[in-house]
Amino acid sequence: MLSIAYEEAERGDTEAMRVLYYAEEGLVWLEKAAEAGDTDAQQLLGSFYKAGGGWFLTTGNRNKAVERWFLASAEGGNPVGMMLYANYLFENDGSKKEIRHWVKTAAEMGHIDAVSTYASNIAHLPNDLDFPEDLVAGYGLTYLLSQLQGGGVAPEDGRRNLPELAKKMTPAQIEEAEVFAEDWAKSHPPLSYFVPVYGY
């Protein structure tokens, strides 16, 4: 099986390169896939460096590499990369405007953690990112999260936050929020953690 992956990787198949990395055939394959523009490889490589992997002369060089790969993944349309980049910016006092952009974009793509972050911020529970308050959308998105099955923190947060949000809203606003949730579910991708096929 690995021989096929090697053949495909040598032909430029970035998925095969990631397979080789997961099969512990070397970090070089993940680096090649990232350099070739594979957004999953880019966010994985950024995460690997952030966790202390790889060798860098200075911490500053490591941070530049982390930022480079998270940004590349985000700009390539990867919702996981978007959230990793938004978190990187938040942890490093980055622009709140840019953080808001990536959180909202990842939420619109269905990333569960992004939807949770976006919903709590627009509902001001709390508003760490300075979003304008939108209780209807915040409740609607929180409701969608609360309906998820299978575990995870976001659904639990959703179920816990709904009553808090309801206290701040009129019955008409809650009804409007339920319609918002229906419309969002119809017009956006299904909510997902975007778990990688070959690893974590």
Where are these regions (language model features)?
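TPR/TPR-like (Sel1-like) alpha-helical repeat modules
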Residues: 68, 101, 131-156, 175, ...
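Hydrophobic face of amphipathic alpha-helices that form TPR/SEL1-like repeat modules
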Residues: 19-24, 44-53, 82-92, 117-126, ...
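Structural signature of tandem alpha-helical TPR/SEL1-like repeats
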Residues: 22-29, 55-69, 92-102, 132-137
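Inward-facing hydrophobic residues that define packing positions of alpha-helical scaffold repeats
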Residues: 30, 45, 70, 85-86, ...
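Terminal, low-structured helical/coil segments at or just beyond the last alpha-helical repeat
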Residues: 153-200
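Alpha-helical solenoid scaffolds that mediate protein-protein interactions
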Residues: 8, 33, 72-73, 106, ...
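N-terminal leader/linker segments that initiate helical-solenoid repeat arrays
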Residues: 1-22, 200
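Short helix-capping/linker turns of helical repeat alpha-solenoids
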Residues: 6, 10-13, 35-39, 51-53, ...
